[in-house]
C-alpha cells in the first residue's frame, strides 16, 4: 500500500480503547498519531484536549466501543466534539468494533430500547461526518446512522490466513447457527466452493437440554467455524464438541471481534477447539494473549488502506472485487 507522503490534510487521532491498533494504522499510512490528551477528571468525567492545530484537516478518530462500552462511547463523542470545535474540515469516526450492535431490534416486542440506534444517533448528532467500521453484527445497522457508513469486511484477511494455515483440500466451513449461514456461504465460496455445514440448535421441549444438529458431512474434516464475534464462547465451544462427536478431525474458529467476556477464557481453555483466530479490532486481555489456543491477526493494513481511499476520494467497495 502506498504511504501518504503529505500529512497536511490527513490526521489520525486515538481514544484510549485501542491505541496499539491506531499506532499500527499510522505506521501503515506513514503518518504520525495526532497529539491529544484523553483522560479523566478525578470524578470520572471525560477530559479531552487536542494539543495541536487541526484547522481544515481531514481527521480520523480510531475508537472501538468495546468494554467498558459506555466509557469508550462517551470518550469517542467528546473527542469528536473537541475536533469539530477546533474547525476541522471533517471527522470520520473509525469504530473497528461497534458496541451495542447486538441490541438492534426489539425481541418479542419487549419494552426494551434499540440501543444500537441510540448509539448511532449520538455519533451522528455530535457531528461525525462519516463512520468507518468492520463487520457490523447486522448490515442494517448502517441505516441507524444519519451519515455515510463504510462497513468493511475482515474476510479477505481471514481467508488469506485460512489458505496459508489450512489450505482447502480437507476443510469444511461451518456456521455456528442458522443466522450466520450467509457469512459462512460467502467464505466457502471464496475458498474455492468448499463444503458448507450448519449447526442447528434447538430445544425439543421445556426443561430439555439444547440439541445441536449438524447439517452437512464433517466426518474426517477440518472444520472452520466462522462468525462476526465471540463473547462468552459458550456456543462456540459447544459447537466444537458437537463437531468432534460427529467425526471432525480438527475444529478451528475464525472470528472478527474478540469480545471474550465473563467465562470466555475458561470455556476456551477447556474446550475442544484446536485454535481460535481473531483480529485486533478489540485489544486482548492478558489472559487471552497468554492462551495458546488464541491467535490474533491485525486489521491495521485494511483500515489504513480504507482511510487512504476515503481521504483521496477513491472507491472503498473495490477493495472487495475479485
From Swiss-Prot:
Annotated localization: Cytoplasm
InterPro entries: PRib_PP_synth_CS, Pribosyltran_N, PRibTrfase_dom, PRTase-like, Rib-P_diPkinase, Rib-P_diPkinase_bac
GO cellular component, one term: ribose phosphate diphosphokinase complex
Record text on cofactor binding: Binds 2 Mg(2+) ions per subunit.
Its EC number(s): 2.7.6.1
Binding site for D-ribose 5-phosphate: 203, 227, 231-235
CC cofactor: Mg(2+)
Active site per the UniProt annotation: 201
Recorded catalytic activity of this chain's protein: D-ribose 5-phosphate + ATP = 5-phospho-alpha-D-ribose 1-diphosphate + AMP + H(+)
Keyword ATP-binding applies: yes
An example molecular function term from Gene Ontology annotations: magnesium ion binding
GO terms under biological process: 5-phosphoribose 1-diphosphate biosynthetic process; purine nucleotide biosynthetic process; ribonucleoside monophosphate biosynthetic process
Binding of ATP, residues: 43-45, 102-103
Chain positions recorded as Mg(2+) 2 binding sites: 177
Entry binding sites for Mg(2+) 1: 137
Xref: Gene3D superfamilies: 3.40.50.2020
PROSITE patterns associated with the record: PRPP_SYNTHASE
Alphabetical UniProt keywords: ATP-binding, Cytoplasm, Kinase, Magnesium, Metal-binding, Nucleotide biosynthesis, Nucleotide-binding, Transferase
Pathway(s) served: Metabolic intermediate biosynthesis; 5-phospho-alpha-D-ribose 1-diphosphate biosynthesis; 5-phospho-alpha-D-ribose 1-diphosphate from D-ribose 5-phosphate (route I): step 1/1
Function summary: Involved in the biosynthesis of the central metabolite phospho-alpha-D-ribosyl-1-pyrophosphate (PRPP) via the transfer of pyrophosphoryl group from ATP to 1-hydroxyl of ribose-5-phosphate (Rib-5-P).
Sequence similarity: Belongs to the ribose-phosphate pyrophosphokinase family. Class I subfamily.
Subunit structure: Homohexamer.
Protein name as annotated: Ribose-phosphate pyrophosphokinase
Taxonomic source organism: Xylella fastidiosa (strain Temecula1 / ATCC 700964)
Lineage: Bacteria, Pseudomonadati, Pseudomonadota, Gammaproteobacteria, Lysobacterales
Amino acid at each position: 500500500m502506498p504511504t501518504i507522503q503529505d500529512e497536511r490534510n490527513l490526521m489520525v487521532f486515538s481514544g484510549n480503547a485501542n491505541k496499539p491498533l491506531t499506532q499500527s494504522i499510522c505506521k501503515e499510512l506513514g503518518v504520525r498519531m495526532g497529539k491529544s490528551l484523553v483522560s479523566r477528571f478525578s470524578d470520572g468525567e471525560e477530559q479531552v484536549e487536542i494539543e495541536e492545530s487541526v484547522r481544515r484537516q481531514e481527521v480520523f478518530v480510531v475508537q472501538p466501543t468495546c468494554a467498558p462500552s459506555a466509557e469508550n462511547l462517551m470518550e469517542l463523542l467528546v473527542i469528536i466534539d473537541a475536533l469539530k470545535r477546533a474547525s476541522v474540515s471533517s471527522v470520520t469516526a473509525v469504530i473497528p468494533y461497534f458496541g451495542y450492535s447486538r441490541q438492534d431490534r426489539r425481541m418479542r416486542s419487549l419494552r426494551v430500547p434499540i440501543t444500537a440506534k441510540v448509539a448511532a444517533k449520538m455519533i451522528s448528532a455530535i457531528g461525525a461526518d462519516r463512520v468507518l467500521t468492520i463487520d457490523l453484527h447486522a448490515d442494517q445497522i448502517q441505516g441507524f446512522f444519519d451519515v455515510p457508513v463504510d462497513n468493511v469486511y475482515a474476510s479477505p484477511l481471514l481467508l488469506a490466513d485460512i489458505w496459508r494455515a489450512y489450505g482447502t483440500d480437507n476443510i469444511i466451513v461451518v456456521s455456528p447457527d442458522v443466522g450466520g449461514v450467509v457469512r459462512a456461504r460467502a467464505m466457502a465460496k471464496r475458498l474455492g466452493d468448499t463444503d458448507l455445514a450448519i449447526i442447528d440448535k434447538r430445544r425439543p421441549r421445556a426443561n430439555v437440554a439444547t440439541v445441536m444438529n449438524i447439517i452437512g458431512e464433517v466426518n474426517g474434516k477440518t472444520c472452520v467455524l466462522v462468525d462476526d464475534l465471540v463473547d462468552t464462547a459458550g456456543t462456540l465451544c459447544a459447537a466444537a464438541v458437537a463437531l468432534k462427536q460427529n467425526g471432525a478431525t480438527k475444529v478451528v474458529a475464525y472470528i472478527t471481534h474478540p469480545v471474550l467476556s465473563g467465562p470466555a477464557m475458561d470455556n476456551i481453555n477447556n474446550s475442544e477447539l484446536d485454535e481460535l483466530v481473531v483480529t485486533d479490532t478489540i485489544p486482548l486481555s492478558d489472559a487471552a494473549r497468554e492462551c495458546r489456543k488464541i491467535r490474533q491477526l491485525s486489521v491495521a493494513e485494511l483500515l489504513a488502506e480504507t482511510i487512504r481511499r476515503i481521504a483521496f476520494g477513491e472507491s472503498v467497495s473495490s477493495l472487495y472485487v475479485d
